[in-house]
Amino acid sequence: MSQFKRQRINPLPGGRNFSGTASTSLLGPPPGLLTPPVATELSQNARHLQGGEKQRVFTGIVTSLHDYFGVVDEEVFFQLSVVKGRLPQLGEKVLVKAAYNPGQAVPWNAVKVQTLSNQPLLKSPAPPLLHVAALGQKQGILGAQPQLIFQPHRIPPLFPQKPLSLFQTSHTLHLSHLNRFPARGPHGRLDQGRSDDYDSKKRKQRAGGEPWGAKKPRHDLPPYRVHLTPYTVDSPICDFLELQRRYRSLLVPSDFLSVHLSWLSAFPLSQPFSLHHPSRIQVSSEKEAAPDAGAEPITADSDPAYSSKVLLLSSPGLEELYRCCMLFVDDMAEPRETPEHPLKQIKFLLGRKEEEAVLVGGEWSPSLDGLDPQADPQVLVRTAIRCAQAQTGIDLSGCTKWWRFAEFQYLQPGPPRRLQTVVVYLPDVWTIMPTLEEWEALCQQKAAEAAPPTQEAQGETEPTEQAPDALEQAADTSRRNAETPEATTQQETDTDLPEAPPPPLEPAVIARPGCVNLSLHGIVEDRRPKERISFEVMVLAELFLEMLQRDFGYRVYKMLLSLPEKVVSPPEPEKEEAAKEEATKEEEAIKEEVVKEPKDEAQNEGPATESEAPLKEDGLLPKPLSSGGEEEEKPRGEASEDLCEMALDPELLLLRDDGEEEFAGAKLEDSEVRSVASNQSEMEFSSLQDMPKELDPSAVLPLDCLLAFVFFDANWCGYLHRRDLERILLTLGIRLSAEQAKQLVSRVVTQNICQYRSLQYSRQEGLDGGLPEEVLFGNLDLLPPPGKSTKPGAAPTEHKALVSHNGSLINVGSLLQRAEQQDSGRLYLENKIHTLELKLEESHNRFSATEVTNKTLAAEMQELRVRLAEAEETARTAERQKSQLQRLLQELRRRLTPLQLEIQRVVEKADSWVEKEEPAPSN
């Protein structure tokens, strides 16, 4: 066992160099290697699954294979003990479920590996371990079935192989590996036959005349994936173990104690965080020596006991998010490019400290900020304003609200142990946004001050991601100008127009160079982020994502409460029994066909006949048709079960056995629930085309429900599963039962699918207007209150709602609500004005182009008129010449006619004289 441990530790320096097998003695492998020594690795994988690692499911190619382990895509390490089914060969395509742990020497380790059956005939040659891999195949009734595709003595090697060891006859290892992972379920023996039969049919089709290089294009449907956490998001505090359980790939510092989730009290369910206000933050791209944006301002009396940091949010606003969602819904008939997901549009402004993205903020200074930060909440706010001004150049003193988002607590070691507290605030950055007039004046001032860059400088500068909004707006403006050729003609001919492009219409706050704008998707979802991200930024991004999940999930919950329940007619007992008998007969027929087809393939090597059941591209057998319309009379429950069985076929899914226990055992990923194979998504999408509408056409939902659906739908598939909708409701923290969640989800679900893209939406708000409070907060009123608070999801009630001001009582809450409504209306009108300005600019461009065209046509018409006048004058001259010539001809005719008659008479006289002078003939 110690020899195996040395082999695991030593040959992996840097996580890339996978060396060969360890040296064995002349007496054979040691006794410890006769049984697979993978208990330690399996226990680690189990801890990772229960602890908090981030997992991915993807398709890769085996690039290296050794005695006890292999490598996929030169970066994912897997042991042979995690292989499900037949052992893969070198160069084969496999389906991998890998877990990421940056603390290990190899960060990506496979948890499960499965060889894909539908692979082309030409593959990379098998390694020298082919005889060992053959032992790991499933045993049939008559023994092991040899794989005819992989024969190393017929196919020459394409890759240089290492010399084969003389002592590699450890049959006990692979046999024990086979016994420890038997085929589960009733399809254990049938799956291998189905896959082999499918491969043989593919080979015959290709041998029948299809070229080797011809390959059917893969479907472009994205895999089904949702943004969902497997735990309730109402825990007020997270310690070291809780963070490891929630976020598996997170490296927690050794001095970390706990983090208090203050956003739960700052944004209760009754007053959630609003993305209504646009707050755009751009990083200046000026080439100047920028200070370290993560460096804290140096003060003489800085005290590390308290630190204040800010989470600067950059969001396009709710109207822009609605517009993207409506584009996705409107493009059902003609799908275009998929719009950008809301998680990619929500960004955070971060600083840089030693090539690492950190939060903006610094330590508390008693002389500059105040004396007691624990008693006076404005002290740490002053610290945040001072540090943000020094690091980013943004003045946050104009912000009206400062919400406490989280509090980190660290333990400073030493003889006098000290507690360090880091308070993270979320200020309302949208209140310091410049107005349209100020923004246009600022852009014009910068355009006037900046000299036009030369072509060489433009060629040397590389595009950066520091000001994406301005670049996108400039690109949109140039795209609109390029759509009409008349506008281009006007720009070329008109020399009075300014050369500088017009400023973008969306105001933004400008930050100093050196900062970075990272999207929420880039922090949480990226497998390989471009920036090194600090621990606090990672935790805050996860917490912000959980807050959005709770808020959007609560909107879905209120929407489900406002919808009427479905009336499902109970199935008749006679039809139900007939449907069950028909389903049993169909299952038996499928099993018989699967057993008979390999025998038919062995006897008939020719092409498949028309009577054989055709196989689909994904390897599924078609369902035999039922007679007499009994398929239409099946109950809805059995139809949904058949759909689930087809979607969860064991040949397609790698995690079929873990699907039901995924939520109960807390094995889900920390930020997503992923469907394992893309073929499942293709089948589901094809089945969605024939589905009826979920709701009555009269049921119209508000746009915030559409945005909530889009938030959970990570890949814009257009639908959500029943299971995921139930989990969304169960993670809200309102203590719903599983039966309650199931009944609510049944209002919008048809055949286990909620096709939200086909629903109707409008700009209406206030779904919870007629709902009682005890219904809005679930079962919280039935449970004992935890501590002092009666309802964690409810906002704290204030007894002093009236404030005396200038001799009159003012209801502050009502004023704030009215101001919020007016602000919402103002933002809506501003968005409409912005849209009208764009249309007006487009109309102006078209009008200018039309004017240029009119001028050109007028000049051409004037020229044609001149040419027409010249042609008319020429015609009149020709007419006069014609008349003159006609008169001359008539005069000549009149004079020549008598002369002709006179000549005729002279000729006649001459003839008569000649006849008279002829002598008489002699007798």
From Swiss-Prot:
One annotated Gene Ontology cellular component of this protein: nucleus
Result of altering residue 591 to R: Loss of sumoylation
SUPFAM superfamilies tied to this protein: EF-hand
Residue positions, PTM Omega-N-methylarginine: 180
GO biological process, one term: Wnt signaling pathway
Region of interest (Interaction with NR1D1), ranges: 704-923
Region (Interaction with MCC): 610-670
Glycyl lysine isopeptide (Lys-Gly) (interchain with G-Cter in SUMO2) crosslink location in chain: 591
Location relative to the cell: Nucleus; Cytoplasm; Cytoplasm, Cytoskeleton, Spindle
Cross-linked residues, Glycyl lysine isopeptide (Lys-Gly) (interchain with G-Cter in SUMO2 and SUMO3): 591
Residues recorded as bearing N6-methyllysine in the entry: 123
GO molecular function, one term: adenyl-nucleotide exchange factor activity
Modified residues (N6-acetyllysine): 112, 215
Entry keywords, A to Z: Acetylation, Activator, Apoptosis, Biological rhythms, Cell cycle, Coiled coil, Cytoplasm, Cytoskeleton, DNA damage, Isopeptide bond, Metalloenzyme inhibitor, Methylation, mRNA processing, mRNA splicing, Nucleus, Phosphoprotein, Repressor, Transcription, Transcription regulation, Tumor suppressor, Ubl conjugation, Wnt signaling pathway
Biased segments, Low complexity type: 446-458
Pfam families, A to Z: BURAN, DBC1, LAIKA, S1-like
Modification Phosphoserine, positions: 124, 569, 627, 675, 678, 681, 687, 808
Post-translational modification Phosphothreonine, affected residues: 35, 454, 484, 897
Phenotypic consequence of residue 839 to R: No effect on sumoylation
Chain segments annotated as coiled-coil in the UniProt record: 829-909
Subunit description: Component of the DBIRD complex. Interacts with ZNF326/ZIRD; the interaction is direct. Interacts (via N-terminus) with SIRT1, which inhibits the deacetylation of substrates. Interacts (via N-terminus) with SUV39H1; this interaction abolishes the interaction with SIRT1. Component of a nuclear receptor-mediated transcription complex composed of at least ZNF335, CCAR2 and EMSY; the complex stimulates the transcription of nuclear receptor target genes such as SOX9 and HOXA1. Within the complex interacts with EMSY and interacts with ZNF335 (via C-terminus).
Role this protein plays: Core component of the DBIRD complex, a multiprotein complex that acts at the interface between core mRNP particles and RNA polymerase II (RNAPII) and integrates transcript elongation with the regulation of alternative splicing: the DBIRD complex affects local transcript elongation rates and alternative splicing of a large set of exons embedded in (A + T)-rich DNA regions. Inhibits SIRT1 deacetylase activity leading to increasing levels of p53/TP53 acetylation and p53-mediated apoptosis. Inhibits SUV39H1 methyltransferase activity.
Name of the protein this chain belongs to: Cell cycle and apoptosis regulator protein 2
Organism phylogeny: Eukaryota, Metazoa, Chordata, Craniata, Vertebrata
